[in-house]
Amino acid sequence: MQKNAKHGKVVIPSDASPWPHEKRVARILALAGHYVEFIPETTIKTPDIYLERTVYEIKSPTSNKLDAVERNLTRALEKCPNVIFDSSRMKVRDNQIRKELVKRRKAGKGLKKLIFITKQDEIVDIEELV
């Protein structure tokens, strides 16, 4: 992923209520130099953030099973074709999750962009691994 500056920025509008795990993802992206803006809540399903003017849905499941990856990608695609998958709350090893994300990206299924945030706060662009 392309960096814009030494440190990016996180914008949280007054009518947005991000979850703590979503704020964590935004902070990691901003520290890598990206501009992140949370999207205000509405009554319809909307993505969570703008990342460099592109909408993304953040998924950070709490599970100890690898099948949570596919289930959460499917849920994310109901809102947006661009997904950020955060493994910090999963009890599955990052290398297993990464393999599953690459597999799902190769299968297509409506995904345009897929970013993986590891337990060590590493940002992995899955497109580069496909």
Predicted features, each with a name:
Residues I49-T62:
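Conserved catalytic cores of phosphodiester-cleaving nucleases, focusing on short active-site segments
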Residues M1-Y35, P61-V130:
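Metal-dependent nuclease catalytic core centered on acidic motifs
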Residues A30-D48:
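A short acidic/basic microdomain associated with nuclease active sites
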Residues T46-Y50, V124-E127:
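Short, solvent-exposed polar/charged micro-motifs at secondary-structure junctions
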